[in-house]
Amino acid sequence: MAEKTYHEQERNKCILELRRLQSELPKFLKDYFRGIEYSTAPRTQIAYATDLKTFFEYIKDTNSMYKNTDIHDIDLGILSRLNAQDIEEYLDYLKLYTKNGHELANDERAIKRKLSALRSMYHYYHKNRIIKENPVTQVDLPKIHKKQIIRLDDEEVGELLNVVESGDHLTKKQSECHDKLKVRD
């Protein structure tokens, strides 16, 4: 039997990882993942599963109705009971929260991605008429602020080039490599 290609191996790893994540998610999400299987990449499905796990952990921790419920046993009815304000509270929670004693923070891009996972899930159930309302459509996507490009000024560029050429402030081993590369180049 021929060995599997790299892509086949990676695909199989993704399938196993997705199955592992699905076992930690509410049972009703199996239909959702089956529904998006052919329209999304395996890594996207894994990212969605991870983000939805965070969402359902939030539901479990903040909703008294689900405090003593295992995430796997949360029912589909939760989607109908949530409104746009609940989703906005979740997005606010994502900015900074504690999990397993560690403080976690998400920037605008991460929050937007997590909201995209929720949008996709709600869209699937709404499109298939399993839920009547889709409160996520009422929530605006976070604005992504452009990162400022940090550039070296002319003086800093000159200093950098001088250090590279001269090999100053290098360890003995680095200096030996520098000398060899200098001769080669």
Residue ranges and their predicted role:
Residues 154-163:
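Short, charged, amphipathic alpha-helices and their helix-cap/turn boundaries
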Residues 162-185:
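Basic, Lys/Arg- and aromatic-enriched nucleic-acid-binding interface segment
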Residues 44, 114, 153, 182-185:
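Hydrophobic (often cysteine-bearing) scaffold residues that line and stabilize catalytic clefts
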Residues 28-43, 53-148, 163, 167-168:
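N-terminal core-binding DNA-recognition domain of tyrosine recombinases/integrases
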Residues 83, 153, 171-172:
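Ser/Thr-centered flexible coil motifs
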Residues 1-46, 77, 81:
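N-terminal DNA-binding module of tyrosine recombinases/phage integrases
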